């Protein structure tokens, strides 16, 4: 009997797949760890632990290690709150159970594998897609095989070694997600798009190379997606099993293929779904009216996309690519208004240009222009925070201002770097304190004048109060010192979707 079959037949749990705490708001199904679990099914015993559901994650892990003999603990790690909990838990496990092997995967360790492995409490990093690589690592460790054959693996062998990158895996070739490993009912909730909303992933990658994007750094302009038929069938299963009536597509670029989008929209028309996804503005603008009508008729309620900047020069520095221009955004805002689909335009303000203050004022004027065309348009504001992307002009421009990342995980726990992770108050040596204040103050006034649709706890009275408080400032372009706006938003616990989920 092979080691993997022995592991699968044993009563204990060999592997814990951990999704660290990321949000205090509505939890989403931890699709990333379920994707890893899919390749372990029938081979190794494993448990999925979600820090967004289990607020005693350390105690749960300790119990499983003690009572069931867990040998491997694997964390998926995004920058921000997940990184903080992953560091603390990994350190505790290493101190209390030094024989347990600790593996990290996800965007943060993919971009910072050397820093992660410099910590004595992380043994291995799986870079990029780990769907098959993680299982291959366990195979090698359980059967005494060579580590050099595991694609995307980084490990310590006298020095840090990085194996060849895992080629992008077509999701059509992957096994179905083991939803039975989590209590799906706990992840279904009320959102702006529906009363029983679930998250779903239908594609990987993106065909563009934006210089501020971790997806572009990992996938290098490649994209692949499930068929429209498969997506529609899966959503029908969710509806029949759990009464789901709304779907958030967490793809990095759901709308890459117009043919797939049209077929999907036609397949789910009349089935009682509403849905949300992420897109490229120029891709959507090129869609035929027939596709737009089908999307609207099928329940497409809101689309998130990167407007980024109202400056063609800044878009070029970002390597936005495609055919996107500021005019693209204005035309799309009008088109989406006609079809009754709400656009969520995200902006990345404060890029390291010689004219950063002038660019900011241009972006503020541009955002106001969008709101005149389509008052329903949601505006999401981020401050540019560099992504480890060695051949990107934008990243190199940041480094020219002496920007550099922390070289230890302990330094990533410092308050300024935790704020950096959330793209709200990043470490940006090229931005003055006055410029940062200008961005934050404009955002406060904008959010008061146009409260986000996604904050469901705001009733008509609260929304009216916000609008009244923000209207005079917005109307006169008076953004400095909006203390009354900040106080009201604090009292109403105003939520920002870019921080707490859309």
Put a short name on every predicted segment.
Residues 14, 39-40, 44-167, 390-391:
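Glycine-rich beta-alpha loop elements in corrinoid/cobalamin-binding modules
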Residues 22-31, 78-83:
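A short, glycine/small-residue-rich beta-strand->loop->alpha-helix junction that serves as a flexible
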Residues 179-343, 349-353:
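Radical SAM [4Fe-4S] cluster-binding motif and immediate context
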Residues 1-17, 62-71, 92, 99, ...:
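Radical SAM enzyme core and accessory elements
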């Amino acid at each position: 009997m092979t080691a993997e079959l022995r592991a699968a037949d044993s009563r204990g749990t060999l592997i814990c797949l951990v999704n660290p705490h990321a949000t205090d708001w509505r939890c989403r199904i931890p699709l990333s760890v379920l994707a890893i679990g899919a390749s372990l099914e029938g081979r190794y015993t494993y448990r999925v632990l979600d820090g967004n559901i289990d607020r005693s994650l350390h105690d749960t892990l300790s119990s499983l290690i003690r009572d069931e003999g867990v040998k491997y603990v694997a964390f998926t790690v995004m920058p921000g709150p997940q990184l903080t909990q992953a560091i603390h838990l990994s350190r505790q496990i290493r101190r209390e159970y030094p024989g347990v092997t600790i593996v990290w995967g996800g965007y943060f360790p993919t971009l910072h594998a050397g820093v992660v492995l410099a910590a004595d409490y992380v043994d291995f990093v799986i870079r990029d897609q780990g769907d098959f690589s993680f299982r291959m690592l366990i195979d090698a460790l359980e059967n005494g095989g060579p580590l050099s054959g595991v694609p995307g693996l980084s490990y310590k062998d006298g020095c840090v070694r990085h194996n060849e990158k895992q080629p992008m895996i077509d999701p059509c070739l992957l096994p179905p997600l083991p939803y039975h490993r989590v209590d799906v009912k706990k992840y279904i909730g009320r959102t702006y798009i529906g009363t029983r909303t679930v998250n779903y992933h239908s594609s990987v990658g993106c065909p563009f190379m934006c210089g501020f994007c971790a997806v572009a750094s990992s996938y290098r302009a490649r994209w692949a997606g499930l068929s429209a038929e498969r997506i529609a069938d899966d959503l029908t299963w969710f509806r029949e099993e759990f009464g789901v009536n709304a779907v958030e597509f967490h793809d990095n670029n759901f709308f890459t293929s117009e043919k797939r989008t049209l077929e999907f929209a036609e397949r789910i028309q009349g089935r009682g779904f509403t849905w949300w996804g992420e897109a490229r503005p120029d891709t959507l603008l090129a869609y035929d009216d027939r596709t737009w009508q089908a999307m609207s008729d099928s329940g497409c309620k809101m689309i998130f996309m990167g407007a980024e900047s109202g400056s063609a020069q800044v878009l070029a520095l970002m390597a936005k690519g495609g055919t996107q221009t500021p005019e693209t955004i204005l035309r799309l805002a009008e088109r989406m208004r006609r079809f009754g689909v709400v656009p969520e335009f995200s902006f990345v303000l404060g890029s390291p240009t010689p004219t950063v203050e002038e660019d900011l004022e241009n972006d503020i004027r541009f955002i106001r222009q969008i709101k005149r065309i389509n008052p329903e348009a949601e505006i999401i504001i981020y401050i540019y925070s560099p992504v480890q992307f060695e051949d990107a002009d934008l990243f190199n421009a940041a480094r020219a201002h002496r920007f550099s990342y922390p070289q230890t995980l302990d330094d990533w726990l410092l308050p300024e770097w935790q704020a950096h992770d959330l793209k709200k108050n990043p470490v940006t040596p090229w931005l003055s304190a006055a410029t940062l204040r200008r961005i934050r103050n404009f955002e406060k006034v904008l959010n008061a004048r146009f409260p986000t649709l996604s904050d469901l706890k705001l009733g008509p009275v609260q929304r009216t109060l916000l609008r009244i408080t923000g209207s005079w400032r917005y109307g006169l372009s008076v953004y400095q010192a909006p203390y009354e706006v900040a106080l009201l938003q604090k009292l109403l616990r105003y939520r920002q979707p870019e921080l707490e989920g859309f």
